[in-house]
Regions:
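Active-site neighborhoods and metal-handling regions in enzymes and metal-associated proteins
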Residues: 1-532
Length: 532
């Protein structure tokens, strides 16, 4: 990384560092330089007018051609219409979020809040500090006959005659590449666009106890939170009621994603396809992983390369767990060895450029073949997954998937003599002994977040009724830890999970990840082919 400030100081970055001044008390003590300015202490930056003038001239004109509309634009407009219908007469403020600091002056790659992406259709790294505002109108006078007009406020491309072009390492074109123009992003999204300098007025105008009610997707952009909190307080708005309204807004925006539209399903298919390619890369890399002290990192790296090649990023931290590490549900350190004879549990997903992610798990024999005990445990988990999938159809309740999978696992555990009670008692609310070896849920919604729709009401999620267009995982598992004295020694250190991404259709379900081998025989043949 170049030796320059990732975060520009309060002064312009081409100014020389401030010179400390002697204290006013006559002691000669030096006032400390403000910390915010010390980012400039490591670099010499030109401050001459000649430099500024030279930087501002001699550039070819930027293209004025406008991009085509995004394929997501009409779908995003329908989602905004649903928000408008739910909250007539109220201003809705949905920030994208801000750049997050990894350490010191180094940021993480930007990833917008999922609600912002859902309502704008924007993916990849669009757009730090942006805010979508839905302004109430008279009934039917808004966009496409809705009750709101939508405007996207963001920081557009700066002219090459400005200091931002070359001096702002967070947003300047010289540092991070071209940014969209107001007209360009309007063409892509179908939204009105405006610069961030207009945001404060748009968010705060007419806010009063008897004025325009404002709903905010809170805890997404701290500056917007602070701005609206100050205005609400000054205007005498009931802060408790406003906080409850904000929570209801987050809830609704989460529930709006429970059923995916055709464009969303298409993007999730792309995420699944890229993820399957990543699993194939891992199988090819397994011989190299076996020869490395931290073979799990070899596995993780092989998958990450595919995620960046075909997608935006990982949908979540990869779980590459070999041997006893596979009994740790969210093992993401991936510092362990990958040893012959062990099982490798790989739980990974590619996030598409649209920000939709897959979430798939396979448990693979490192040596290419399952032992008898590994196969026995694997088949129990596979049977549970198949049983849950078999009942998926519109009209059943989401919670039934878990119950069906648990019935199968309890039957197998009972048959192996592992339960200290009868199968009937184990399945009762007062029992649940089987959850010692399967402590997590069987399913979760999937989409823009790996655990999508997380703020939805219980009656629409766990107790909800399945509808066509819902996408969720089915992922039972069994985990027998090395130190578990309640199971035979031959079971210890074995963890198995099988996870697929399921789309509810009009008359049943489709396993979006079914092309990835699932049975022990299929897995062994697949691995042999890829490693030949």
């Amino acid at each position: 990384m170049t030796d320059a400030a990732q975060h520009p100081a309060q002064t312009t970055p081409d100014q020389p560092a401030a010179t400390p001044e002697a204290g006013a008390d006559g002691t000669g003590a030096v006032n400390p330089q403000p910390l915010a300015e010390r980012v400039d202490n490591r670099s010499q930056r030109p401050a001459s007018n000649a430099f500024r003038d030279f930087m501002a001239s001699g550039w070819a004109p930027s293209s004025q051609a406008l991009p085509d509309p995004d394929a997501s634009a009409p779908y995003a407009a329908r989602r905004r219409a649903a928000v408008s219908a739910r909250f007539p007469g109220e201003r809705i403020v949905v920030p994208a979020g801000r750049l997050k600091v990894r350490s010191n002056d180094t940021d993480y790659r930007f990833r917008a809040h999922s609600a912002f992406a859902h309502l704008t259709g924007l993916g990849v790294d669009h757009e730090p500090d942006a805010v979508l505002v839905l302004e109430p109108t008279d009934p039917g006078a808004g966009d496409d006959g809705t009750d709101h007009t939508a405007t996207l406020y963001f920081r557009p491309l700066a002219g090459r005659d400005t200091e931002q072009f070359y001096a702002d390492s967070r947003s300047g074109e010289f540092w991070i590449g071209p940014r969209p123009t107001l007209a360009g992003l309007a063409a892509r999204t179908g939204l009105r666009t405006a610069g961030l300098e207009e945001l404060e007025s748009a968010v705060t105008k007419n806010v009063a106890a008897d004025g325009t009610a404002v709903r905010l997707l809170a805890e997404t952009d701290q500056d917007v939170d602070a701005l609206l909190a100050a205005v609400r307080t000054e205007a005498g708005v009931d802060l408790a009621a406003a906080a409850e309204a904000d929570a209801q807004t987050a809830e609704f925006l989460s529930e709006l994603r429970l059923v995916k539209d055709a464009w969303e399903v298409e993007r999730m298919r792309a995420s699944v396809a890229a993820t399957i390619a990543g699993f194939e890369d891992v199988v090819r890399a397994l011989p190299r992983a076996v020869g490395h002290d931290r073979g799990e990192r070899v596995v993780e790296g092989a998958f990450f390369a595919r995620a960046r090649l075909e997608g935006n990023d990982l949908g979540y931290d990869t779980i590459a767990a070999s041997g006893n590490n596979a009994t740790i549900l969210h093992w993401i350190r991936n510092t362990g060895a990958v040893r012959p004879g062990e099982l490798l549990l790989l739980d990974a997903g590619v996030e598409d450029d649209s920000l939709y992610t897959a979430d798939i798990t396979r448990t693979l024999p490192v040596s290419g073949t399952f032992t008898d005990v590994q196969r026995r445990i694997y088949h129990a988990v596979l049977d549970a997954a198949d049983a849950a999938f078999a009942i998926v159809r519109p009209g059943i309740r989401f919670r039934e998937l878990h119950a069906e999978a648990m019935r199968v696992l309890v039957d197998r555990l009972d048959g192996w003599g592992l339960l200290p009670v009868s199968a009937e008692v184990a399945l009762s609310d007062e029992g649940q002994h089987h959850r010692r070896w399967m402590p997590h849920g069987t399913s979760h919604h999937l989409g823009l977040d790996v655990h999508d729709c997380a703020q939805a009401k219980r009656e629409l999620y766990l107790d909800g009724v399945l509808e066509p267009g819902m996408v969720f995982t089915i992922e039972p598992g069994l985990y027998f830890k090395e130190e578990d004295l309640a199971v035979p020694e031959e079971y210890r250190g074995i963890g198995v999970r099988i996870e697929d991404d399921i789309l509810v259709t009009e008359d049943g379900a489709e396993n979006l990840s079914a092309v990835l081998p699932r049975t022990p025989d299929e897995i062994e043949a697949w691995m042999a082919r890829l490693q030949a």
